[in-house]
Regions:
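Terminal-appendage/accessory-domain detector
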Residues: 4-18, 25-238
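Extracellular interaction modules
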Residues: 1
Length: 238
């Protein structure tokens, strides 16, 4: 998976959305359009990608996507690791002074996370690090926060991070996977730390990331602060 983690990995969705907006604006200005882009024989979308089957939409076109967009607010990390990051940060006060006493860290997640962001071994760049579930959790447990600086080479050189990664056991909970794929569309993760003396932390689990539509009330103040902070470096805000 590491060869897929470079600085351009996050461009695809933004580029596709920009192109969609461009086409929408052209349409509103009277662009004639191409009515057989989907249905044209041989070279149409349906023939090329769907083996001739027509494109079917699961819901009417409208505002569903905008109303249910998931904001990446609390932590700069791959979407599937967002709830795990929140679990780790919550556990930081119980763990930060006992790092040398840790026997293992158990991570419970869903199958998409297992396939996409569970990575063992070296992480060669910042893009690989923010796409590694174990790295994100290790930083949260050790430092109690995760920022863009957490992925830089100097920060990643802290030996405690890889040492803690090596102590992690990741397993799938099929209920989490079912709820991820099903109507709930949740992003469930859980973290629990076990110590050498036999004691353990509570198992902390979070089902929906803070940027999910179901957590809008607590997310909006954070989103406002993030927007203000990012924009203030480019424009003067009164």
């Amino acid at each position: 998976m590491l060869f897929r983690s470079g600085p351009r990995k996050s461009w695809a969705s933004g580029d596709a959305t920009a192109r969609a907006m461009q086409l929408a604006l052209l349409t509103m200005r009277g662009e004639m359009g191409y009515p057989t882009a989907l249905s044209a024989k041989t070279w149409g979308f349906s023939d090329v990608l769907y083996n001739g089957r027509p494109l079917k939409v699961t819901r009417p076109y409208g505002s569903h996507v905008i109303e249910n967009v998931q904001f990446k607010i609390a932590y700069p990390a791959q979407r599937h690791s967002q709830t795990a990051a929140e679990c780790a940060v919550r556990l930081n006060p119980l763990v930060k002074d006992r790092l040398d006493d840790i026997a293992r860290v158990e991570l419970t997640t869903h199958k998409p996370a297992l396939l996409k962001i569970v990575v063992d071994g070296p992480l060669p760049n910042f893009a690989a690090r923010d796409h590694c579930l174990q790295y994100v959790v290790a930083v949260g447990l050790i430092f109690g926060d995760i920022t863009t600086a957490s992925y830089e080479d100097g920060f990643a050189a802290d030996p405690r991070i890889d040492r803690l990664r090596a102590q992690m056991v990741v397993r799938e909970d099929r209920t989490y996977t079912r709820d991820y794929d099903g109507p709930r569309q949740s992003n469930h993760n859980a973290v629990q730390v076990f110590f050498k003396d036999g004691s353990r932390t509570p198992k902390v689990d979070v089902e929906f990331l803070i940027g999910d539509a179901r957590r809008r009330k607590e997310a909006m103040p954070l989103l406002d602060r993030k927007s203000t902070r990012l924009n203030s470096s480019h424009v003067a805000l009164s």
